């Protein structure tokens, strides 16, 4: 450090100089609010808008018009005086604006009543200026407001389309009909919609199972989009009223439910495959290599089909 002085003295002097510099810097940037009378006269306590006052100066009040008789007596003076008075008035107004502080404060006090009277018009013009200054923002808002109803309509259109699914109704004569249903629709609703008046006669078969319970939903039966449901119309007839009781008894005997053919197809096919394999093992000379390969393929395919139907 410095010779002849201790370290503590040097540190203390450095801190004092630092604090003094900070204090001087703060005092140089400090401005007392409201202490200067000139600032108080320039900025009024009411609505402070000096830029608007200076940019829009109040025109000098015109002198009262002279009577018509005086103007008729002195036409030449009336023609010359207004020009000089207007020039003098404009020069005085410019000098007052540039130099006279009190005149500026007075005019600033005189302007607010006019603004209060036309306050609504100024607000409207200010709003129009804001909109003119930001046309991109206004355009974006309009596009957003137009896109909102379109998006809502798109959502309402997409929701029913997403909920619907197609189911193919296949009849015994190899004809098909496409049904538009929902997963929560029941078997009874499907029958009443596409077979009105024939609900009791129509039998629906899906994957070898008879859909006899009308309260079951399509979702609970694992019926998905583009599935095939086999439809069978039974020939059951209602007993007709006749005079003889014998004819009524015979008609009641013939009425009845047809046996479930779909449930018998799988056992019959299993028996047929078993017989073919029996003949293949005992009489090999009658089966060629392609016939054996095709028999193996049919057996494997049928095994996967049965496993898929009853494995769920």
UniProtKB/Swiss-Prot annotation:
Residues 140-161 have a biased composition (Basic and acidic residues). Its main location: membrane. Residues 235-253 have a biased composition (Low complexity). Residues 53-91, 108-161, 235-256 are annotated as: Disordered. It is a multi-pass membrane protein. Residues 118-131 have a biased composition (Acidic residues). One of its GO terms (biological process) is ERAD pathway. May contribute to the regulation of translation during cell-cycle progression. May contribute to the regulation of cell proliferation. The membrane form is involved in sterol-regulated ubiquitination and degradation of HMG-CoA reductase HMGCR. May be involved in centrosome assembly. PANTHER family: PROTEIN C7ORF21, TRANSMEMBRANE AND UBIQUITIN-LIKE DOMAIN-CONTAINING PROTEIN 2. This is Transmembrane and ubiquitin-like domain-containing protein 1. It comes from Xenopus tropicalis.
């Amino acid at each position: 450090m410095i010779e002849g002085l201790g370290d503590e003295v040097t540190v203390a002097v450095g801190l004092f100089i630092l604090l003094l510099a900070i204090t001087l810097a703060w005092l140089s940037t400090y401005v007392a609010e409201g202490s200067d009378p000139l600032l108080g006269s320039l900025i009024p306590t009411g609505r402070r808008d000096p830029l608007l006052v200076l940019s829009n100066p109040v025109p000098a009040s015109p002198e009262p018009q002279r009577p018509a008789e005086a103007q008729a007596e002195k036409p030449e003076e009336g023609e010359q005086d207004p020009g000089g008075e207007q020039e003098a008035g404009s020069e005085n107004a410019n000098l007052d604006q540039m130099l006279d502080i009190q005149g500026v404060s007075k005019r600033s006090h005189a302007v607010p009543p006019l603004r209060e009277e036309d306050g609504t018009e100024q607000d409207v013009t200010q709003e129009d200026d804001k909109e003119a200054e930001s046309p991109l923002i206004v355009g974006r808002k309009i596009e957003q407001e137009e896109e909102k109803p379109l998006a809502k309509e798109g959502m309402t259109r997409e929701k029913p389309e997403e909920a619907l699914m197609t189911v193919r109704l296949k009849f015994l004569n190899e004809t098909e009909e496409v049904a538009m249903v929902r997963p929560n629709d029941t078997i009874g609703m499907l029958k009443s919609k596409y077979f009105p008046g024939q609900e009791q006669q129509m039998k629906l078969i899906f994957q070898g199972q008879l859909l006899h319970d009308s309260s079951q939903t399509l979702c609970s039966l694992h019926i998905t989009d583009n599935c095939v449901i086999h439809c069978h119309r039974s020939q059951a007839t209602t007993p007709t009223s006749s005079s003889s009781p014998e004819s009524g008894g015979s008609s009641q005997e013939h009425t009845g439910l047809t046996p479930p053919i779909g449930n018998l197809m799988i056992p019959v096919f299993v028996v047929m495959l078993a017989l073919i394999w029996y003949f293949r093992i005992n009489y090999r000379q009658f089966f060629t290599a392609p016939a054996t390969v095709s028999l193996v393929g049919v057996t494997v395919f049928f095994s996967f089909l049965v496993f898929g139907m009853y494995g769920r």
